[in-house]
Amino acid sequence: MDITVKELSKNYGEKEVFKNFSATFKGGKTTVIMGKSGCGKTTLLNCISRLTDYNGEISGADGVSYVFQEDRLLPRLTVYENLEITLNDFKEEEKISKIKQILSATDMTDKATKLPEELSGGEKKRVALSRAFISSGKTILLDEPLNSLDLGLKRKIDEYFLNFSESEKKTAIYVTHDVDEALFVADTVIILDKGKISWAYDFTTDKKLRKITDDESVKVREKLINLLF
């Protein structure tokens, strides 16, 4: 199901972030949002997830999982238990299979019995991402989810996200400043500027077949760099 935003308006005190903003995010696809700091990226995610009040209409965002810039793990639960609580709708065998799969994909199998306080910042981020990936909801909002991770792990998690979001038909809205990351995961990329969409692009190449060196990727990369930096 598409996520539809109609005539969204949002102020923080005297600061106007959005005024009559409208957009459609395609169901089962990943839309990457980019833009300079303060353009409204995080505010838009907060509105879609109903974490803040707003004027306007937002529909289609059901069963939302939100990966914040900071991890929000339950401190008294182990890594395994933090993942397990998102899977109440699944049978026990399915729970075990999903958790084992995501722990392996994120190199966290040996951390399953650890508490959050025993993890590094990057490890906590991986658990937070994993929890969103395996939830039963069909909408994932990601706010710069891989900032604290090294490049190799970023690409590994992006690849898992790519496969999992497609197989589970997840609708994802993914905020990042990393152009290469956007090229890797996006079906559509948009740039926000002062609460408006200043540029948007729908990829024609299947992202599973896409390479950074493809003509389309090179063209989009150059455009993004020119507009953002």
Language-model features: where?
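Catalytic Walker B motif of ABC-type/P-loop ATPase nucleotide-binding domains
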Residues: 140-144
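Hydrophobic anchor residue at the start of the ABC signature
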Residues: 129
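Conserved ABC ATPase "signature" region
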Residues: 93-111, 161-163
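Conserved ABC ATPase signature
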Residues: 115-119, 123
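ABC-type ATPase nucleotide-binding domains, specifically the catalytic core motifs of the NBD
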Residues: 53, 81-96, 105
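Helix-to-loop junction immediately C-terminal to a conserved catalytic motif
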Residues: 49
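Conserved structural motif at the start of ABC-family nucleotide-binding domains
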Residues: 3, 18-20
